[in-house]
Every structure is written in C-alpha cells, then in structure tokens.
Amino acid sequence: MSQSQMMLQQKDLYTVQAKPQVPFGHLRALWFQITGTLCNLTCVHCFISCSPTNHSLEFLAPETVYRYLDEAVQLGVREIYFTGGEPFMHKDLLAILERSLQVAPTSVLTNGTLITPRVAEALGRLQASSPYSLEIRVSLDDVDEAQNDAVRGKGALRKALQAMQRLQAQGIPPIVAVTEYLYANASRDAASDHGEEQSQGEGSGFYRKFRDFLLSNGIDKPRLKMIPVFAMGQLEGAVPLAQYVTTSMLEGFDSDTLQCTSSRIVADGGVYACPLLVGEPQARLSTDSLADALQPCTLYHTACHTCYVTGMTCSNY
C-alpha cells in the first residue's frame, strides 16, 4: 500500500470516529492574518500556500483590526501577533502597529525582505515611543544561501540578513524562525543511508549552525524559534504518515499546552481557532465577534496532531 493510500485510509477511519474537542481557557494571544494568503515570496513549504497571486484570503482593513483590538482589550488579551502572507506588504502596517503597541506586546512574523532602512527606522521609533515591546520574527531555512534560496527564492537570505542587521541597529534584536524542512529531509536521507542512529543528535547541530551564523553577522543575542514541518499547504501529502488526534490521546493530557486553548486568529472571513488553520471552514468559530469565538474547538486536522506531539505553538516561545 502506498503512503498516499495509507493516509486516505486513515482519514476515512477518522471521519467515522468522534473528533475530540478542547475547551477554551483565557485569551492570551490574538493573531491577525493581516495580508491573508498574499506574500511576495512563494516558499516551497508554506503551510497555507501563500504567494503573490493567492487571493484565497485577502488583506484585513485597518478598521477591522482596530475593532478586534478594542474587543480583545475587554477580554484581557496579553499578546498581539501579525502574520500573513507577508505583513509588510500592508500599506497601513506601521499605523496598525502603533495602535497595537498601545494595547499589548506585539510581534510581526515576516520573511524580512521588505524591511528597508526606512521601514527599520520607523520600527525603531515605534519601539522607543510605545508602552509595550515590539518583536520582529524573521523566517529562514538555512544559513547557506543556495539552500535557503532554493526554498524561499533568489536573494531571500541576503535580504533577510540585511533586515535583521537593520533591526539590530534600531534596538530590536530579531527572533529567527527556522522551519525544520531542510533538516527533516536531511535526517531522513541520513537515516536511510546509515541507519536510524546516524541522525540522532543532529538537531542540536542544526540549532548551533544558525546561532553561530547570527553571531558572526552582528546579531549578538540570537534567539531561535524552531518550527516542525506540517503536512499541509505546499507539503500536503508529502510528510510521511500524517496522523490525527483521537479522544483517547487526550486522556490525562494537559490540553492547556495546545495554543488553541488560549489564542485565536482574525482573518478574512472571521475568527479561526488556530493560525495554522485560517481559511478552513471547520476551524472558523465566528464571523464577526471575538467573544463568540472563545469556545471549545475541534482537533480535526493533521496539524493538530503535530502540535500535540511536538508541543509546537506559533508564539515566540
């Protein structure tokens, strides 16, 4: 039986089983998919297949963001995140960040390629004048230009590094997010060629490689966020034996470790349970009210299993 046939068989079995739910606790983090699925890059592993031409989810209007920010304050939000697509494609992003930084600590997830000297200076001014902290999280895949750009596009590493150095100069030490796409592929190849034991311990070397790269390029307090590979978007069907969470798996499990118990994301079309599942009809919990979306959600997707197994959250830490 092929891998794709096994996944289909597993999915068919899952559809007749009760799908587990987890309760909502408190609103720790509110996310905004501010540029929808529109991005200036077309990364080969993007979990929602963002690109310059993907209009599945459109930009959020500033008025929409402000309305949800006001509601989030009343609900006790502690952190705000902006993601995409590529957030710096949004012409009103700086004004939106100024408003958000009056509410809570705010982070932007970006590929870094649009952070020009002017933008970096504006971010530095926002950081200096705001009551809450501003974090910028830049995505990379490798410290080798050829390897990284094979995933993200020509010039992506050079531009991202320039962005990080500009942010550092403005007093905003960047967080670097690394998807384990290239490492996972290399580990599978190593295990295939040399046996399972050969690949053990490689993860720490992967981490050190990025840390040393950042230090050597002037990022003197490197912070890394490692992100597992998800069997969705551009990689749907490509990850071996993607699985689902079952009710029995939650017995004795602390569901508070799952981000869907304490965060929600606003995107084109409403409020969704998880940043990984924006645009998914089953993950949409409300069309226009954040309060209405603070309800139990169903763990119906393979991404839920990845979070369950790895402890992954989309937050900075």
Model-inferred region functions:
Residues 6-84, 88-99, 103, 118:
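Conserved alpha-helical substructure of the radical SAM core
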Residues 1-5, 232-235:
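Eukaryotic acidic, serine/proline-rich intrinsically disordered low-complexity regions
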Residues 33, 83, 109, 177-179, ...:
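Short hydrophobic segments within beta-strands
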Residues 225-317:
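Accessory C-terminal segments flanking Radical SAM cores
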Residues 19, 61, 153-156, 199-203:
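Residue-level preference for long, well-ordered alpha-helices that form the structural scaffold
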Residues 53-67, 87-128, 136, 140-159, ...:
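Canonical radical SAM enzyme core domain
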Residues 79-80, 103, 107, 130-140, ...:
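Conserved C-terminal portion of the radical SAM core fold
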Residues 30, 119-125, 208-211:
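Short, well-ordered amphipathic alpha-helices
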